[in-house]
């Protein structure tokens, strides 16, 4: 999937995407699992204007439903995103917070795996901030191996070789996003 994302988003010009008027600001906190996303969200949500929403699955579910078929991305649908379908996802995402009756203006979504969807994030939410949590690769991979994650979503985390392969593909994808939209990604190093 990572190579597929790079291939499909390579020719997208994110500078041409119109900014939407957002009633609430959103900060996406992402990175490899066990890279510090929870800690970053806890620090940010201690501010009175920030609501820490935790790991939301809405974005990934919406992308899987509307843009992926057997882990293959429909490029035409990405191109069409600049039409009303993008607006619908944008509005629906914020509607999921209506049940909370929030008086806070900033919302965080700390789903680590959202690093895969940074291209979609910049189309759906051009004004969103993205914090990419980075950790020493060896420490991150050992921590992944020592934890018991759900096999359905992270079956690669049970084997050291698969973890290394996944991390390498992650690193290539992150390098692509940072080259493609450098001013929109803030990299936060766990050890600093």
Each PLM stretch: what is its role?
Residues 53, 58-80, 100-192:
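PAPS-dependent sulfotransferase catalytic domain
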Residues 1-101:
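Alpha-helical solenoid repeat scaffolds of the TPR/TPR-like class and their adjacent stem/linker regions
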